[in-house]
Amino acid sequence: MPEQLNTRVEDCFQLAESFFKRPFKRPVVSLKLRGQKAGVAHLHENLLRFNPQLYRENTEDFLKQTVAHEVAHLIAHQLFGERIQPHGEEWQLIMRGVYELPPNRCHTYDVKRRSVTRYIYRCPCAESDFPFSAQRHKLVAQGRRYLCRRCRQTLVYSGETRVE
């Protein structure tokens, strides 16, 4: 899996070198990115991080568009310096001119959200539930109190959980 990714990164750099007729410093490539982002270019560290799940699920478009998108950020930074917009004219020039791709800012990959457990708290005055995150539930266990906005009574854990 990473071989194709590294090959595409190298291909993108070679296209840029051919287009601009100058060498560019190669980045470190990592598959340590989670969440909604498909890729991130760390300009000062010369590092590219890619999301392995989105890569697996969208390999063809990922290799074509996402890799070029992130490499274009590094190329733009090496060519034009710090004072450019992330998706500004310089980056767009590279996307269109070098890679002949549309300069899309965001991907359209289907991102699966992980399930989240909510801890149900209740107030003595109302029938309403207050779903707490794991972090907030832990804070309650450590002594933090949360009050009902209506009656100002302390919310109490019901013993119930819900997976969203």
Swiss-Prot record:
Catalytic residue positions: E70
SprT-like domain span: 14-156
GO biological process, one term: response to stress
Cofactor: Zn(2+)
Subcellular location: Cytoplasm
Pfam families: SprT-like (PF10263)
Residues involved in Zn(2+) binding: H69, H73
Alphabetical list of NCBIfam families matching this protein: PRK04860.1 (NF003421)
HAMAP family attached to this UniProt entry: SprT
Protein name as annotated: Protein SprT
